[in-house]
């Protein structure tokens, strides 16, 4: 019998109460949805025997291997989209693969609720497996398994090697140990065009590539205008310019110049892939002195999590040198809770640990910003929660308008 009977009863009541928020076609808040997910996960832990919980957690590696194998076999695309069943023999023929092997992989996926398994040797799509019909989601799953996975698995060995005093950095850490390479992870990606293509495709998914919708760009630039010839936004490390394009789409009447800064090859790729003419470009690394000085906004999207505190501080100080008394620094990144951090955010921090970076909690962001002699004005949260927060910082001498 489960050993946590009291929790089972309490959590069941809580889930029932939260579930009523979904009745009659209502759309609950993000907070209600997150509370329901958390309570459901806690109920699963309480309902299992303690030993079963250990085995369930340990087996998640095999679950991911099954899904990755299904992607390699193209099972998601070959499964009938209308939800009708297909036999193992039929789908194996389409895959040109051994039926017994395919059946075992599909069985493992279905046990994790990816695919339905209504009858013997027959499988079908369900709501979860249909998510993988979108190619970018398959690319993301493959990217995390193939790339981050090897690095994460090396964390314990690297920690032992360093006697748990350090987890290394961008150029020497679990990633280099896991892949037996001296290259940084970005150099490793760029050395293989197909690997880089897969990475970029995975990064386009909504949960990873969401733009900075939490911050009121229009209000900030209306209160502190830069004029049509002034620099409104510099997107540092902005890749193909997706964030600037998104901001322009959301706020088409913004006045001022939009500038993309990234490595020369990245900018060349951006232009080859249709970078709009309204976006100017300037080549440079994160740590080169910024040539676009006195911009109203210096924007960093999913950049700081690449770096440890030491390099992040260097990046802040480099940007600080380009700012004036009307400049804002916007850091679009995750903000982890100091207490009760969500599991996927905590696991993402370990993903970044394996690559030599880190996700940061609110107190860690505050400490980092203040150590650079900057002022943390506000952490902006949008309706997607802490996965898509924006940290706003300014010089202590800031003369612009507050947005609170």
UniProtKB/Swiss-Prot annotation:
Induction: The expression of the dibenzodioxocinones biosynthesis cluster is positively regulated by the transcription factor dibT. InterPro entries: COMT-like, O_MeTrfase_dom, Plant_O-MeTrfase_dimerisation, SAM-dependent_MTases_sf, WH-like_DNA-bd_sf, WH_DNA-bd_sf. The active site is at 305 (proton acceptor). Keywords: Methyltransferase, S-adenosyl-L-methionine, Transferase. One of its GO terms (biological process) is secondary metabolite biosynthetic process. Pathway: Secondary metabolite biosynthesis. Its EC number is 2.1.1.-. GO terms for molecular function: O-methyltransferase activity; protein dimerization activity. S-adenosyl-L-methionine binds at residues 237-238, 262, 301-302. It comes from the Eukaryota. O-methyltransferase; part of the gene cluster that mediates the biosynthesis of dibenzodioxocinones such as pestalotiollide B, a novel class of inhibitors against cholesterol ester transfer protein (CEPT). The biosynthesis initiates from condensation of acetate and malonate units catalyzed by the non-reducing PKS pks8/GME11356. Pks8/GME11356 lacks a thioesterase (TE) domain, which is important to the cyclizing of the third ring of atrochrysone carboxylic acid, and the esterase GME11355 might play the role of TE and catalyzes the cyclization reaction of the C ring. Belongs to the class I-like SAM-binding methyltransferase superfamily. Cation-independent O-methyltransferase family. This is O-methyltransferase GME11366.
